[in-house]
Each structure stands twice: as structure tokens, then as C-alpha cells.
A protein has these predicted regions:
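Membrane-interface "cap" regions at the ends of multi-pass membrane proteins
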Residues: 1-29, 58-63, 67-80, 84-91, ...
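Transmembrane helix-boundary motif of multi-pass solute transporters/channels
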Residues: 10-50, 232-235, 246-249, 253-256, ...
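Extracellular loop-to-transmembrane helix junctions
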Residues: 35-61, 141, 387-391
Length: 454
């Protein structure tokens, strides 16, 4: 059946929804531990430079493709080319969110569990050694939390673009900003935290390495929602009178600012707690669920800060999972002509089935691995390290070789809107973006198989 395509009410609706997609676990969880691991301020500096060039270019390109066609990734690619090899790029963009959102929802379920424990006054419990591993290995508890998070996401998707996604983003994003400011101020004013602030904000060239560059580029996919089909989909919901460059610049600045705030929330606090112990700063993915509860438990008002922090993370996780799910649902609506209700229901079933593999992968299914990885780790590797760089390369080829930079410029400058960084866009989309995406692809695969160390 045909469906009426939804749309955002205006610029603010697009900016907050797209920023909500970007300000997810990638910024709150992944960015701080990568910054801590790869040199602090030097990582931040490299990331900002890349966000202003690589990130800016890809956001403009994907949003423009979506608005030009009014379609989700598969339909957008088909609108410009009938070559099967290139149209595969559209399908890769469409499949990525279908694979990401199930395991993403599992992590969202973990956040719900921690928030519930803090609300019940169990800050000491979650700070105990072995709590996290005990929780995720308990198949029933982990699965229930995952299902609750999934249900929250689907309920918002059922409501539609303006009444669901946009309305929720307008509520959650301001709260997220306020909470991040409160926690960051509290964190940087702890005794001993200023050394952590210095590590995160004052560049030290001795900490620079090639892996700093590669890791910052990889993080950008998460932080700016690049190559996930989200920006093409959200671009298709953007009204023609909304200026693309200023809107996407706002998204870029907003997402980067929240990533910096996340670093200020976490790195100084961990630095103060550990006395600058490098092993604590480089705890990796366990930073949020193992190290941070210990940090909060050692602080005054630790329970209150824990509630605020995990509420913030829950909002961030929800806004991103909503965007990922919407991208997948939009593709099902466009390509199979399903109603929103049917497309959302089918996507929900897929989320439960695939997500359960990741949820149970540390418990009852712990002995089942794919190329030596647990299900969650495998889906993360497949999407982030393989499919997303390929999707980015496909978008670069589509814009530079098929659509043409001039047509993208015409879309960006519609109604007299400016395109101030057109020269940067031209150079990046033709040469540098595909080159860097290829570097990420090769480096990530080499690291996964142990050929290089990241």
C-alpha cells in the first residue's frame, strides 16, 4: 500500500532529531574511552579537524541525497543509477541500521538496569567487582532489560515522524544538555580532576600516533551518524525551504559539543578517582559499566550523580535507536509499500530475534561465537568496521561520479541558501573522503584479525 511520507516541521525539528541520532552511545560511551586511550587532547584535536572536513562533507552529501529524492537509501540510490554495483551501496546503507539497532538496544537495556539500580539506592551494589559480568551473564535479566528498551523505541516509531521522533527529540535533547552540563561541572570540580581536564583539553604531541587518526575517523561514523542510512532518511523528511548547510552545521557542532561534554564528564572524574592511573583511563568499553560506578561510589552525592548520568545515557541511547529504527522502517515502507504500522512491527520482530543473540551471547549462548567473537562484538565489527566504510565510499562515488557536485550544490543553495564550504566539500567528496574511508576499512579488518594493534 502507498503511504504518505512524513516530514519534520522545520529546521529545529530536523536539527534536534538529527543531533539526537548522533548524540547516542557513540558520543557518551565510546568517545571518552577512545579519547582516553589515544592521547586525550590530541585525539580531540584530530577528531575536530576531521569533523569539520570529512564529517561535514558526508553529512551534507547524505542529507542532500535524501532531500533530492524524498526517499530512503535504497530508493535514493535507485533514483540516480540503474547499475547493480552502485545500487548495492543503497542496500548496504539500508541494512546497516537493521543490524546495528538490535545490539544497540541490548546496551540500552544495560543502561536501564543501571538506572533502575541507582533509583533503588543500590549504588554500592553496581560498584562491586563482578556486578557487570554477573548481570550480562544472567540471560533472563539482560533479556528483559533489552526487551523494555526495544519496546520504548518501537512505541515512539509507531507515533510517526513529527508526532513521535521530532516530539521526543525536542523533549529529550534539552534535558540531555542540562544533565551533561551539571555532571561535567561536578566532575571537573572534584579534587584532583584538573589534571584530567588538562589531559583532555591540552594537546601533547608526544601522545600522537597514526592510530589516533584512524580511531578518530572511525569514531566519527558513530558521533555524526554517517553511513548508517539515517541522514539520507532524515534528509528525505526535510522540507525544501530548510537550509541544508546551516542545519547540518548545527548538527555537527551539537554532536561534537556533546562528545566534548562527555569527555569532561568522564575523564576528569576517572582521573581523580585513579590518581591518573593509565590502566583506569584506558579501561575501554567497560569504562561506563565498571569504572564509572566505582567513581560515583567514591564521590559525595554519588547516587544522585549516578541517576543523572544513566538517565542522560538512556536519553542519548533512545534518540539514536529511534533514528536507526526509523531508517530501517522507512526503507521497508518505501521498497515494500508497507504501512508504518506493519513496517514497524516487522522491524520489531527482527530487533527481538537479532538482539536476543547479542543479549544471550554473554550468558546461555556464551560458547557460540562467530569468527571468534561474541554475537554483539561480531555485529559491531561487521557494521562499524566493514559495512559503514563501504557505505561511505559508495556515497562518495554516487555524489562525485554519478550525481555530480554541481547538482548537490544546487540542492544546498536552493532558495538562495549559502554553501560556504563548497571548495572543501568538492575536494573531500572526490578524493579525501573515499581515501580515508578505505583506510578505516583496511585498518579495522587488519586489527580484528590481529595483523596490527589498535
Amino acid at each position: 500500500m502507498d503511504h504518505k511520507r512524513g516530514s519534520f516541521s522545520g529546521k529545529i525539528g530536523f536539527v534536534l532529531s538529527a543531533a539526537g541520532a548522533s548524540v547516542g552511545l557513540g558520543n557518551i560511551w565510546r568517545f571518552p574511552y577512545l579519547a582516553a586511550k589515544y592521547g586525550g587532547a590530541i585525539f580531540l584535536l584530530v577528531y575536530i579537524i576531521q569533523a569539520m572536513t570529512f564529517g561535514y562533507t558526508m553529512i551534507i552529501a547524505e542529507t542532500s541525497i535524501g532531500r533530492m529524492t524524498g526517499k530512503s537509501p535504497v530508493g535514493a540510490y535507485k533514483s540516480f543509477s540503474d547499475k547493480p554495483a552502485l545500487r548495492v551501496g543503497g542496500w548496504i546503507n539500508a541494512i546497516i541500521p537493521i543490524l546495528i539497532v538490535p545490539y544497540y538496544s541490548v546496551i540500552g537495556g544495560w543502561v536501564i538496569k543501571y538506572l533502575a539500580e541507582y533509583l533503588m539506592g543500590k549504588a554500592h551494589l553496581v560498584a562491586e567487582d563482578g556486578y557487570f559480568s554477573s548481570f550480562i551473564s544472567n540471560g533472563v535479566s539482560s533479556e528483559l532489560c533489552f526487551l523494555v528498551f526495544t519496546a520504548m523505541t518501537l512505541a515512539i516509531i509507531f507515533a510517526g515522524v513529527e508526532n513521535g521522533i521530532e516530539r521526543v527529540s525536542k523533549i529529550m535533547m534539552p534535558i540531555l544538555v542540562v544533565l551533561s552540563l551539571i555532571i561535567a561541572v561536578y566532575s571537573v570540580t572534584r579534587p584532583g580532576a584538573l589534571e584530567g581536564v588538562k589531559y583532555f583539553l591540552v594537546p601533547n604531541l608526544d601522545n600522537f600516533s597514526w592510530m589516533t587518526v584512524v580511531s578518530a575517523m572511525g569514531q566519527m561514523f558513530y558521533s555524526l551518524s554517517i553511513a548508517m542510512g539515517i541522514l539520507i532518511t532524515f534528509g528525505s523528511y526535510m522540507k525544501k525551504d530548510v537550509p541544508i548547510e546551516s542545519s547540518t552545521r548545527n548538527v555537527e557542532v551539537f554532536a561534537t559539543a556533546i562528545a566534548i561534554m562527555a569527555g569532561l564528564m568522564i575523564i576528569p572524574a576517572v582521573f581523580a578517582f585513579s590518581g591518573g592511573d593509565p590502566s583506569a583511563l584506558k579501561a575501554g568499553p567497560s569504562l561506563m559499566f565498571i569504572t564509572i560506578p566505582k567513581v560515583f561510589d567514591s564521590m559525595g552525592f554519588g547516587t544522585v550523580i549516578g541517576i543523572a548520568f544513566f538517565l542522560l545515557v538512556l536519553f542519548a541511547a533512545l534518540t539514536s535507536s529511534i533514528a536507526l529504527t526509523e531508517s530501517a522502517v522507512s526503507t521497508l515502507q518505501d521498497e515494500l509499500h508497507w504501512s508504518r504500522k506493519k513496517a514497524t512491527s516487522i522491524m520489531g520482530i527482527s530487533m527481538v530475534l537479532l538482539g536476543s543473540l547479542s543479549s544471550l551471547g554473554y550468558g546461555p549462548l556464551a560458547n557460540v561465537t562467530v569468527i571468534g567473537m561474541q554475537f554483539l562484538d561480531f555485529f559491531d565489527f561487521l557494521t562499524n568496521s566493514v559495512m559503514m566504510p563501504i557505505a561511505a565510499i559508495a556515497s562518495c562515488i554516487l555524489v562525485s561520479r554519478v550525481i555530480g557536485v554541481d547538482r548537490i550544490a544546487d540542492e544546498v543553495t536552493r532558495n538562495g541558501a549559502p554553501f560556504r564550504r563548497r571548495k572543501v566539500f568538492n575536494a573531500m567528496i572526490r578524493f579525501l573522503c573515499p581515501f580515508f574511508a578505505a583506510i578505516i576499512l583496511i585498518s579495522s579488518i587488519a586489527s580484528a584479525f590481529g595483523w596490527i594493534s589498535m
